């Protein structure tokens, strides 16, 4: 598993009791080429090697299931390869930069809902291949037919509004 601190984030964020790190599972930081990036690799392995666009960015021992890398962000592909104590590859995991197009994905947790039941639906901006675009900031308004909107939330720290609103405005 690879997680990256938001590359564009200049100000410090306070972590909550629910959040152990501010790193996100994304390599889609549009406009951030050449910026420093902190990468966390989580693995049950002896060591991990990180590759950026096919070139090794170094190898690190894994401590408490995590290895940290400080690298320079480049669009493309980031791959973590984990190795056992004998240097044999045991796993690899990659993230890719998102394409230019932006799509609002609507992903319900369940295909059907019982009467009086709740539907949990994730809204997420991606490219046409489904690669998450965490830097996208747009206004979202939700309308529900044949039901009631019980809450609308976002984990983003820069969002105005509360859980009972029907729309969110992202600050830029």
Language-model-detected regions and their locations in the chain:
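Short, ordered, surface-exposed loop/turn motifs in non-cytosolic proteins
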Residues: 134-140
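Conserved small/polar residues in nucleotide/adenosyl-binding loops
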Residues: 169-172
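Short, acidic Ser/Thr/Gly-rich low-complexity loop/linker segments typical of extracellular
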Residues: 58-62, 157-163
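Short aromatic-acidic-glycine turn motif
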Residues: 143-158
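Short, solvent-exposed loop/turn segments enriched in Ser/Thr/Gly
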Residues: 116-121
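Substrate-binding clefts and catalytic carboxylate motifs of secreted carbohydrate-active enzymes
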Residues: 1-115, 128-132
């Amino acid at each position: 598993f690879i997680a990256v601190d938001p590359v564009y984030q200049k100000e410090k964020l306070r972590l909550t009791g629910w959040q152990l790190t501010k790193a996100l599972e994304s390599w889609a930081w549009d406009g951030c080429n050449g910026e420093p990036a902190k990468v966390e690799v989580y693995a049950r392995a002896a060591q991990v090697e990180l590759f950026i666009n096919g070139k090794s960015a170094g190898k690190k021992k894994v401590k408490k299931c995590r290895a940290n890398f400080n690298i320079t962000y480049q669009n493309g592909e980031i791959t973590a390869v984990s190795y056992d104590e004998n240097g044999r590859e045991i796993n690899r995991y990659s993230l890719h930069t998102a394409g230019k197009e932006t799509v609002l994905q609507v992903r319900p947790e369940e295909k059907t809902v019982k009467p009086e039941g709740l539907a949990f639906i994730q809204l997420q901006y991606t490219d046409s291949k489904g690669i998450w675009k965490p830097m996208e900031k747009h206004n979202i308004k939700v309308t529900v037919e044949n039901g009631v909107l019980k809450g609308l939330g976002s984990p983003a720290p820069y969002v105005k509004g509360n859980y009972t609103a029907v729309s969110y405005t992202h600050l830029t």
